[in-house]
Amino acid sequence: FGEEIEALEFFVCVDIFPTIATAYADVIFPDCCWGEVDGTFTNTERRVQRIRKVLDPPGEVRPHWWVLQELAKRINGYDLGFTSEESVWEDMRKTATSCAGITYERIEEVGLQWPCPTLDHPGTPLMHTSGNFTRGKGLFHHTDHIPPAELPDEAYPFLLSTGRRLWHYHTATQTRNSVGLENLFPEELMEISPVDAE
C-alpha cells in the first residue's frame, strides 16, 4: 500500500480519524461521521433510504459534496452545481436511470428499491422473478491459483488467520477510536491449541 501511495505525485485523503492512508497524505480533509450528514444510504438489498444529520460536525469539518465542489472550483474553476446532499442525489438520478424515480420526497418515510426508473414506479423489491436474467444465469470464470507469498516453514510453522469481532468493524481503523467500544474490547487476543502453544 505504502509504495503505491508514495509513488503518487500528490495524495489527498478524507477521513474522520488518522489512518494508515492519512499517514501518507499530502493534504487531509477532515470528514463528517455518519451522524453528522444528511443524504442517502443504499444497502445490499438495493434499498435507497434517507439518512439525517443529528448533530453538526466539529470545527470546520464539511461534508464530501462541499469538499468536492470547492476542490473543483479552486483547481480548475469548475462548478459542479452542488448546493446540498439532495442536489448531489438529483444529479445522480439524471445519470443512473435505475434510480431516476427515487426522490427525497418519495423516500422520506420508507426507502425504495432500485431499479425505480420513473416517478410512478413502485420500486423493485424482487428482481428476476420470471427466472430470466438480463445476462443469462451466473457467469463463472476460471482463474489460476496464485500461491501465497509465504508458507509455513521450520522457523515459522504457523499461519495467522484473522477473524471478526462483535465490537469492532473491519480492522477497527475507525471503531478503535470509539471510547465505548474500546472499553468493551481494549485489546486483541490470540487463540492457539495447547499443543501448538508449547
Label every PLM stretch briefly.
Residues 1-59, 90-198:
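A cross-kingdom feature strongest in bacterial/archaeal respiratory oxidoreductases
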Residues 65-81:
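Non-catalytic, well-ordered alpha-helical segments in soluble enzyme domains
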Residues 83-88:
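Short catalytic/ligand-gating loop segments at beta-alpha or beta-beta junctions
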